[in-house]
Curated annotation (Swiss-Prot):
Name of the coding gene: SLX4
Lineage of origin: Eukaryota, Fungi, Dikarya, Ascomycota, Saccharomycotina
Protein name (record): Structure-specific endonuclease subunit SLX4
Assigned GO CC terms: Slx1-Slx4 complex
Modifications the protein undergoes after translation, according to the UniProt entry: Phosphorylated in response to DNA damage.
Keyword DNA damage: yes
Length: 681
């Protein structure tokens, strides 16, 4: 054994020496290589440029780019070599019903265009006619609006637009036989007839050079007789110039009525006119309107004035004396003409110039205040004189004040643009009469009577015997029992003198024991005494008794459900259930049923304790300041306050945990809960 160990040790020693020798040689070689690397860095850099051979490029197939997607699609799916439509439809994921509907619509459209147009339409190489999306006039309008909307375009784009315009004019000259007006022509020709150069210059903010060339482009040399401008919506709704008047004008010796102006001119009038003067003005207006009937000869006036709420009844009427002619006001901020307005002739109040006059409003009553313009217009048409078989109804209800035309501002007109700021119309309110509502006042008295009570019948008094109140504070009335307790409620009407005496009695000048007087809607309600519920708890607890047919097990189960501490005697359990029933306003029998609402009863007990705490300032401040409440003191204070609130420390601890009140258990050095106390844990 020893020889083997010796041999192994010698072998290990030789291996170790050999390993040390190899490690020393490697260290020497690394030192030599490190010293030689310094000379390697000092070698000069070569100035020869080496050419890197690139890999040979493979011959790629040149793919022809698709010049037109339409040509590509037509080349892929056109019918050739007797190919059927079913083969084409199968290519579209077997959705034959969708493709069939599309093809039928395209074929119907092409056939309809070919039949409707007399002149041959341009066709492609395949002979298929193409449908015309826009007419020539529509293309002209599109190009003009592009130039106005984008005045700073590139030279290439501007040249393209000019080329398209030239082609369209050439086609227009060729097809000049077609005189049917298109939609764009009708829409564009309406506002262009009534505009002048100053209006165009103001509308598009053009300079003299742009006005000379007739476009917003500075270097456009195309000749065009038509104007290259577009109007706003409010100006497009203006009336077109006509050579003949649309309405019949009757001239008489009566003074010219004042023009009906914008809504912003109407102001609210003070209530200074008497009722007699209003009635006289109404009678004069009705006589004057009925004496000179006039028929409106055109329907355009009615269509153009449908948006005017204040004259909606006049435009539909056929019994008005005279009309107003169309007037054009060359104001810079309002580029339109006033529409024809039919106004009845009313006499002026004063002959002085620029005096304010009063015109009648629409025949809508003051109490008919509509929320939407749709309803307002419908009701105005229904109430107009024309809807009453030609009979003129009563018009003026509330006067409106209008200013004279000389006082008008430039920004106030019938049609306003974006630069004007019209004000809203103010409606004149009628006379309001303050009527005092007469209310009767009653006095209610509740009297507690012990024993048999007899009262003579009387017409002035109403005797009500309270039975089974919800709150449980009032018990059943048993007049046959001499030792029972009754509560009688007496209600009768009182006058002001009696009410004053009642207020003095409630404030504390007179105290009549348990009698409580309640006067609804009187100023003394805030100083009433405590509610009848808190005063009758002791009476209810005395009268309620536990029926004898219930066992102690049932009562113990009810106490356990209410989290009450267990009682040893049956009388103690009955007393606890009686106190809980009196506070919750229910009977003891209802607490002993299987489906009794124990959670609701427990919440009512918690509410009764909370109300008692809120009425005492000291205990309420302790709770609000998070001062730890000593449970023994709290129990003693509740027992002295009301015998129905006698609970043990365990139940009060559950109440405090439920309400989030801090508590502690310790001894006190004070005598009562109202003094300063110290607690020791």
């Amino acid at each position: 054994m020893s020889n083997d160990v010796y041999f192994e040790s010698i072998h290990m020693q030789s291996n170790y020496e050999e390993f040390e020798t190899q490690a020393q040689e490697r260290e020497n070689i690394s030192k030599i290589s490190t010293s030689l690397s310094k000379f390697r860095k000092m070698s000069p850099k070569s100035t020869r440029s080496f050419k890197v051979k690139s890999a040979p490029l493979t011959n790629r197939k040149a793919r022809n780019r698709i010049k037109s997607i339409n040509a590509h699609v037509s080349a892929q799916y056109k019918v050739s070599n007797g190919q059927q439509n079913d083969d084409i439809l199968d290519f579209f994921l077997k959705r034959k019903h969708n493709i069939s509907s599309i093809l039928e619509g395209v074929e119907d459209l092409e056939n309809r265009n070919i039949v409707s147009n007399d002149t041959p339409q341009p066709s492609d190489n395949t002979g298929n006619y193409s449908s015309q999306l826009f007419t020539q006039e529509e293309w002209f309008q599109i190009l003009r609006r592009i130039k106005l909307r984008f005045p700073k375009l590139s030279a290439r784009t501007r040249k393209s637009l000019k080329y398209v315009t030239t082609k369209l004019e050439h086609l227009k000259n060729i097809n000049s036989d077609d005189d049917s007006p298109q939609l764009w022509t009708q829409a564009a020709s309406l506002p262009e007839e009534g505009l002048v150069n100053e209006d165009m210059k103001w509308l598009y903010e053009l300079d003299d050079e742009q006005m000379d060339i007739g476009s917003s482009f500075c270097n456009v040399d195309e000749d065009s007789d038509q104007k290259l401008f577009v109007l706003t919506l409010s100006q497009a709704m203006g009336e077109r110039e006509k050579s003949e008047p649309d309405v019949e004008i009757i001239s008489d010796s009566s003074p010219e009525p004042t023009q009906l102006l914008n809504d912003g001119i109407i102001e609210e009038e003070h209530e200074v006119d008497e009722e007699e003067e209003d009635n006289e003005n109404e009678e004069k207006s009705e006589k004057q309107l009925a004496s000179s009937p006039t028929q409106i000869s055109s329907d355009d006036t009615q269509e153009q004035l449908t948006n005017r709420a204040e004259i909606s009844s006049y435009e539909a009427s056929s019994l008005f004396p005279n009309t107003l002619e169309t007037q054009k006001q060359p104001v810079k901020s309002t580029i339109q003409k006033q529409a024809s307005v039919v106004v009845p002739d009313y006499p002026k109040i004063s002959n002085v110039k620029d005096e304010e006059i009063i015109l009648s409003s629409s025949p809508t009553r003051d109490n008919e205040i509509f929320q939407t313009p749709r309803k307002y217009s419908v009701e105005s048409v229904r109430s107009s004189p024309s809807s009453r078989s030609g009979r003129l109804g009563r018009l003026m209800v509330s006067p409106l004040k209008l200013l004279s035309p000389d006082r008008l501002d430039a920004s106030q007109s019938v049609y306003s643009t974006a630069r004007s700021s019209p004000t809203k119309q103010k409606r004149v309110r009628g006379r309001e009469v303050n009527e005092k509502i007469v209310r009767k006042r009653f006095k209610t008295s509740r009297v507690e009577v012990a024993g048999n009570f007899h009262l003579k019948a009387s017409d002035d008094l109403k005797i009500v015997s309270t039975v089974d109140k919800v709150n449980g504070s009032e018990v059943e009335d048993s007049e046959d029992d001499d030792h029972s307790v009754s509560i009688i409620e007496i209600t009768h009407e009182v006058n002001d003198e009696e009410l004053k005496a009642v207020d003095e009695e409630v404030t504390g000048e007179a105290e009549d024991g348990p009698s409580i007087i309640q006067v609804p809607s009187s100023p003394g309600n805030e100083n009433l005494q405590e509610d009848l519920t808190s005063m009758q708890t002791s009476i209810a607890s005395v009268t309620q008794e536990v029926p004898s047919n219930y066992t102690a097990t049932q009562m113990r189960q009810a106490l356990r459900s209410l989290d009450f501490p267990p009682e040893r005697s049956k009388e103690g359990m009955a007393s606890s259930l009686t106190r809980a029933a009196s506070i919750a306003g229910t009977s003891v029998s209802s607490l002993l049923t299987p489906d009794a609402p124990y959670e609701e009863v427990k919440n009512q007990i918690y509410s009764a304790i909370s109300e008692s705490v809120k009425k005492d300032q000291l205990w309420h401040e302790r709770v609000l300041s998070y001062e730890p409440i000593v449970l023994e003191e709290f129990k003693q204070w509740l027992g002295e306050l009301d015998k129905d609130l006698k609970f043990d420390v365990t139940f009060l601890q559950q109440y405090c945990d439920h309400m989030g009140i801090t508590t502690t258990i310790g001894t006190t050095t004070g005598t009562t809960a109202g003094t300063n106390t110290t607690t020791t844990d």
